[in-house]
Regions:
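Acidic, Mg2+-coordinating active-site environments of NTP-dependent enzymes
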Residues: 12-16, 71-79, 185-331, 355, ...
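Short acidic-hydrophobic, aromatic-tinged amphipathic segments that line or gate anion-handling sites
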Residues: 83-87, 412-422
């Protein structure tokens, strides 16, 4: 890893090196926090968690061939190199910031209330048509996950597409300091993490912290149909590029046609050029993700042919609108996370399903003092949708179920108090030929519901 010598690591994280002097100039081969991934030449960063203190794994990591380890305490009688630091978490962020600077490659930072992951996937797919692109994997988008993503970069990578997720003020500033993006993309401002951020104005303030470490002559790409983002006129003399359905946006879409659960077709207008794309994922919200990707592709010099190819070769990922066909059902696996905006969008897509259309929904978390009202609003939306069965699970989802039934007395609404009860009764609620949407916040562990359906 470029310039990641033990000497540089100790210096950038303010640590004290203990060990043989002849090891100081050796470069680490990888940086890990999971002791099970120990390999020859790695640097181990033991994180102190709520349940596990990873310092206890230091001996086995060193035995597996690690070059060195960080440690928040002095290790008496250690016969291996280590760097004593005040905080392993802060150290790993400092090291990641240093390492990314050494590589000197463009960085696209992506945030927003809804659609971060899908937008990241499309942008990476587009950029990969011209550049060797590294993207965030899974949910590695927080103060630990972002550094670990950065450490996956190697000399052959030409651009990084980094997802940045937050739940409180100040977090984005810390993430942006590591990433220092050339291009900042904000998908939208919704009702997420209101427990800490208060309201949508708070969400806007927290998300736009990403601009604080925007590199000079950088770019800002924003959703021009979002009433909060449209108020961002410029930052440090950098004027945003807006995308949306309005022809007042620099990048806009029209002639949007649904192909059911197979995807969408739309025309993208990019400057004086217009071209049609087939989006291989359903939902009008996907059009916005694609427009953001087109804007970013244009910034980095891709042709319209390359942008189109990147969009049309997109592959869905687990838990994010992935279609699973079994012998009995079509499962719409959207269970990774949920908030009111994404929940409504998923219900809209479900209406295009064949057979009985069943929504299996669970509680949404971190919504603050308006959590009951926001669940009721989703219930009202469900009641107005052309679906056949609504199954609500969780304490807060009782409010969703009740509002849905009041909105549409003809809708079959089922309430289960918890996931265990749902799993016990689920087989009796579904039948061959159903299209089944599964969606809830991550803490509800609805991937177990998807697995149950797959195995029926």
């Amino acid at each position: 890893m470029k310039n990641l010598t033990l000497e540089n690591i100790a210096r950038v994280c303010g640590g004290t090196y203990y060990g043989p002097a002849d090891k100081l100039q050796e470069e680490v081969m990888s940086v890990i926090t999971d002791s099970r991934k120990a390999e020859e030449g790695c640097l181990f960063v033991p994180i102190v968690g709520e349940r596990v203190d990873a310092h206890k794994f230091i001996p086995q990591v060193m035995e597996a061939g690690a070059l060195a380890t960080l440690s928040e305490r002095v290790l008496d009688n250690a016969d291996f190199p280590y760097i004593a630091v005040e905080s392993s978490l802060q150290a790993v962020k400092d090291i990641a910031e240093f390492y990314l600077k050494q590589l000197q490659i463009p960085v696209v930072g992506i945030t927003g209330s809804v659609g971060k992951t899908s937008t990241k996937e499309v942008i990476a797919s587009v950029l990969n048509q011209k550049y060797h692109t590294l993207k965030t994997q899974g949910n590695f988008n927080n103060e630990l996950g972002l550094p670990l993503t950065v450490f996956r970069l190697r000399d052959g990578d030409e651009i990084a597409v980094l997802e940045m997720g937050i739940s409180d003020f100040g977090e984005m500033t810390r993430l942006a300091q590591i990433a220092r993006p050339d291009t900042c993309v904000i998908t939208n401002i919704g009702t997420c993490h209101l427990e800490n951020l208060g309201d949508r104005n708070g969400v806007l303030k927290a998300k736009t912290e990403i601009f604080k470490f925007l590199r000079p002559e950088g770019h800002i790409v924003l959703n021009g149909d979002d009433d909060k983002l449209i108020t961002v006129k410029e930052y440090e003399k950098i004027k945003p590029v807006f995308f949306g359905m309005s022809n007042e946006c620099q990048v806009y879409g029209d002639k949007v046609v649904s192909r059911g659960l197979k995807g969408m077709t739309c025309t993208i207008h990019l400057g004086d050029t217009a071209f049609t794309v087939d989006i291989p994922m359903p939902g009008r919200h996907m059009v916005y993700n694609v427009l953001a990707a087109a804007a970013v592709g244009n910034i980095y010099g891709l042709t319209t042919e390359q942008i189109k190819a990147g969009i049309e070769s997109l592959e869905p990922i687990s838990g994010r609108f992935r279609m699973i066909e079994t012998d009995k059902f079509l499962i719409v696996d959207d269970c990774y996370n949920a908030n009111p905006m994404s929940m409504k969008a998923s219900l809209d897509v479900l209406q295009d399903g064949a057979g009985r259309r069943i929504a299996v929904l669970g509680d949404m978390g971190e919504l603050g003092e308006n959590e009951v009202q926001l669940h009721e609003e989703v219930g009202e939306h469900a009641g107005k949708c052309d679906i056949d069965v609504l199954i609500c699970t969780g304490k807060l989802c009782r409010n969703m179920a009740e509002r849905a039934q009041r909105t549409n007395p003809n809708l079959k609404v089922i309430y289960e108090p918890d996931r265990e009860s749902l799993l016990e009764h689920l087989e009796g609620y579904v039948q061959d030929g159903d299209t089944i949407l599964v969606k809830a916040s991550h803490f509800m562990k609805f991937e177990e519901v998807v697995t149950k359906l797959e195995n029926m």
